[in-house]
From Swiss-Prot:
Part of the 50S ribosomal subunit. One of its GO terms (cellular component) is ribonucleoprotein complex. InterPro entries: KOW, Rib_uL2_dom2, Ribosomal_uL24, Ribosomal_uL24_CS, Ribosomal_uL24_KOW, Translation_prot_SH3-like_sf. It comes from the Bacteria. The keyword Ribosomal protein applies. It holds the Pfam family ribosomal_L24. This is Large ribosomal subunit protein uL24. Keywords: Ribonucleoprotein, Ribosomal protein, RNA-binding, rRNA-binding. One of its GO terms (biological process) is translation. Belongs to the universal ribosomal protein uL24 family.
Amino acid sequence: MHVKKGDKVKVITGKDKGKSGKVLAAFPKKDRVLIEGINMVKKHTKPSNINPQGGILNVEAPIHVSNVMLIDPKTGEPTRVGYEVKGDKKVRVAKKSGEVIDK
């Protein structure tokens, strides 16, 4: 998967197209990511000990990883991600600027 937790990404398709946010969680087996403030859905909860009131909550839902692009740390524009072997480590590289993403 080309994005990891903590990356800044931009949504390129769907109802939140054009918005950007930070990746809160990545689910590689399902090819989905959870992005801060993106793909908000209403979740209905029953009253419980933790939430005695119950009600409707707004929570983020996962979005497919193909619908997001990583934001280039150098230019601030969305970019595709490539991989290079530097020394004995495989690092992610921004295709637009050639900037190494993994530090």
